[in-house]
Amino acid sequence: LLRLTPCHDRLQNVISSELTVSVPTQSRDYEDVFGNRVRRLAIDNPFSEMVIESKSVVEVLDVDPLGFGPLRVTSAFPLVWMPWQRQVLDPFLLPPELPESELAELAEYAMSFVKRNESDLLDTLLDINHTIYREYQYKSGSTNLATSAFDVYVNRRGVCQDFTNLMICLARLLGVPARYVCGYIYTGPKAENTRQGEASHAWVQLYLPEVGWKGFDPTNGILTQTDHVRVAVGRNYIDATPTSGTIYLGGGPETLEVDVRVDDLEP
């Protein structure tokens, strides 16, 4: 499965997109349950190398990330949603499967942000976002796909995927729907973002009352704007991973190399 075509919606306009694979395949394109554009490949012939190349031109609309006034009120935590809202939001409200003791400690950690921000929803979420950026060390190779949100909390280090998983967990424990976003980030000379510029990037989208989904990037301590290009979203990394697949026959040692380049096209 390939999730390499950027999202197309009211905030992100895909002007052109091309996805090529260097070996013969049978392919089928479809939209998954999260609205991601997916290409399913079937490869029958052996190969020693496969190159997957995705090129897209995307217009990301510039909007004020803090232009939502209704949130400047105190809230009761965890947030309570109407039954018809929960039908849609439930997949993004379930905390990860962790021991009760670990979830309890993470819930206490999440509530500490609520208390020091006097139950203001937006200030609480901004505080969590910036605290992860400020107090957690970005260290490649320090974690793997099995690293839990609690492990990241205890060890205070990781990469964008780990910081995203931690913020998703904390938000859900506060009753805030949270989803995993995989995409790209522009880190050119005019951009203030400095981490994760040469590979795919991960961040969080939180569903805010009377506002909708808003992007938070705890790796860089910012809200997402025109420097972030969304490619796929889901409940977690597995739902949004750029590539995945299964070898049914044969197989052997394998390596994966990823190269990402994001350029700013002048109008």
Positions of PLM-derived features:
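A structural signal for short, well-ordered beta-strand segments
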Residues: 54-56, 204, 258-260
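Generic structural "secondary-structure junction" signal
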Residues: 4-6, 21-23, 36, 43-45, ...
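Intrinsically disordered, low-complexity acidic/polar segments
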Residues: 11, 61-65, 213, 225, ...
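Intrinsically disordered, low-complexity N-terminal segments that are enriched in acidic
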Residues: 1-79
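Short beta-strand segments enriched in hydrophobic/aromatic residues
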Residues: 58, 208, 262-264
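Hydrophobic/aromatic-rich core segments of domains that either
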Residues: 130, 162-250
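Secondary-structure boundary elements
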Residues: 73-158, 166-168, 235-237, 248-266
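Glycine-rich, flexible loop/turn motifs
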Residues: 26, 30, 64, 75, ...
